[in-house]
Amino acid sequence: MNMANLPEVTVRDLARSGVHFGHKISRWNAKMAPYIYGVHQENRIHIIDLRKTLPLLQAAMKVLYNVAFQGGRILFVGTKFQALDIIASEAIRCGQYYVNYRWLGGMLTNWGTISSSIKTLVQYEKVLNAENSILTKKELGNIEKKRQKLDKALGGIREMGAVPDVLFIIDTNKEHIAVKEAEKLEIPVVAILDTNSDPDGITYPIPGNDDSRKSIELYCRLAADSILAGMESSLARSGVKVGDIKDEEFIQEKGDSIIRTKKGRSKVYKEDEKEVVTNEDESR
């Protein structure tokens, strides 16, 4: 398997994105000590050792590449406000799935119920799109409200079809339920761990700032690029010339579905605060 097309990243890139800024020393988790370089004396925040971060990040990128190469499902998870739009846009860009509103208990461990809710969402859409509906304007309005609520929670996983093969998580403290569910089902977790995080149960930890938008953008871009690289290699192995795919469109079979990603969009065709400041925020 040729990984030459994996995205490149350096310690300098990490530093420019503020990945090294941790939390106030009073908020640290002692289990993160191996990844801490020292303390910023003026602001009393921990500084993450980017020499430790880089190889762990590269290892995680290879994992995402391999899962994509094999046609697996990857779920991006990040519900903090700094990450909402980034998580969605990068997951869509690489034809994968995301949760960016709220993690519903049982999203993994009770997939049957979640699937039923997704079917309800689809049914609502059919009713709302039906011509010559016999429903009143008020009834349609109530259905639209229910549709919006379900779409907000489940829109990013509506085409996933089954539990994912790996999770990519921003902020394991906020997404602790997702971590626990993945651990219970033995689903590998790639996660960004800040200095206040618990590394226990994280299969592929990446020590780094999980509050700065600039840092989050870097992680998610690298994750999406690694996934696209894996898909590209898979296509090349099957004899498809990537240069022949129009408009930067990638096609990848997933079970009984074909995922198409085109200019930041994905469709499924069935076949049958740190920067919040700069980490020097006093609230940290």
Swiss-Prot record:
Q: Which UniProt keywords apply?
A: Ribonucleoprotein, Ribosomal protein
Give a Pfam family name: Ribosomal_S2
Which GO CC terms are listed, alphabetically? cytosolic small ribosomal subunit
Disulfide-bonded cysteines: none
| Swiss-Prot/TrEMBL GO biological process terms | translation
Q: In which domain of life is the source organism classified?
A: Bacteria
One GO MF annotation is:
structural constituent of ribosome
List where the protein spans the membrane. Answer: none
Q: Which InterPro entries match?
A: Ribosomal_uS2, Ribosomal_uS2_bac/mit/plastid, Ribosomal_uS2_flav_dom_sf
List, alphabetically, the NCBIfam families matched: rpsB_bact
Q: What is this protein called?
A: Small ribosomal subunit protein uS2
Q: Which organism is this entry from?
A: Wolbachia sp. subsp. Brugia malayi (strain TRS)
User: According to the entry, what is the taxonomic lineage of the organism?
Assistant: Bacteria, Pseudomonadati, Pseudomonadota, Alphaproteobacteria, Rickettsiales
| The encoding gene | rpsB
